[in-house]
Design a protein with these regions (language model features):
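Conserved PLP-enzyme active-site core in the AAT-like
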Residues: 2, 11-13, 18-19, 81-198
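N-terminal "arm"/small-domain region of PLP-dependent enzymes with the aminotransferase-like
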Residues: 2-62, 70-71
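Short, basic and Ser/Thr-rich N-terminal targeting/leader segments
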Residues: 25-26, 77, 126
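Conserved N-terminal alpha-helix of the aminotransferase class I/II PLP-enzyme fold
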Residues: 40-92, 114-121
């Protein structure tokens, strides 16, 4: 895989995609399909059993999305990424993967309004408590932490406040307690790379 340095180049050419093997076109094709043909029943069984990597169904994986995910991971400096339909879907996806009913997260008070609605209404209906900490003092996250805390949450540059979230400080507190920090990086990896800060 090429090691590009500039975000513009990574955005256009990052990930592993170089050209279409059949046509040699350098633009990523848009695959408008929901399903894929399997070589045989054994291959299908291996794919569905997650013993083999490959396309099963577009909702799970699509070659176009695969390129997008690899480029986003490269831009963020991460190992992998998952493309979802919206920022709200990404936030919900992250939290629902670490929490179950009875668990809680500690979130920054500086949040986009839609996220506040997700946290106060949707997650509470699923039995997930959201505790709100003022990020001006990162220790506020630790004060609200207990044995059922599964994640800390913040926005790198929250809308509409634009007060930069103390990523490193909250990540350090999280590491001390074995709690992951989830960052909504809507501001983009061109402006901020949360993984570089903890």
């Amino acid at each position: 895989m090429a090691n590009f340095k500039h975000p513009e180049t990574i955005g256009l050419h990052g990930g592993e995609y170089r050209s279409d093997p059949a046509t040699t076109a350098v633009a990523v094709p848009i695959y408008q399909t929901s399903s894929y043909q399997f070589k045989n029943a054994e291959t299908a069984a291996n794919l569905f059993g997650l013993k083999e990597f490959g396309n099963i169904y577009t909702r799970i994986m699509n070659p176009t999305n695969d390129v997008l995910e690899k480029r986003v991971a490269a831009l963020e400096g991460g190992l992998a990424a998952v493309a979802v339909g919206s920022g709200q879907a990404a936030s919900a996806f992250c939290i629902q993967n670490v929490c179950q009913a009875g668990d809680n997260i500690v979130s920054s008070t500086d949040l986009y309004g839609g996220t506040v609605n997700l946290f106060k209404n949707t997650l509470s209906m699923q039995g997930i408590e959201v505790r709100f900490a003022d990020p001006k003092d990162p220790k506020n996250f630790e004060k609200l932490t207990d044995e059922k805390t599964r994640a800390y949450y913040g926005e790198s540059c929250p809308n509409p406040y634009l007060r930069v979230f103390p990523i490193k400080e909250v990540a350090d507190i999280g590491r001390k307690h074995g709690i992951p920090l989830i960052i909504d990086n809507t501001s983009s990896p061109v402006i901020c790379k949360p993984l570089a800060h903890g």
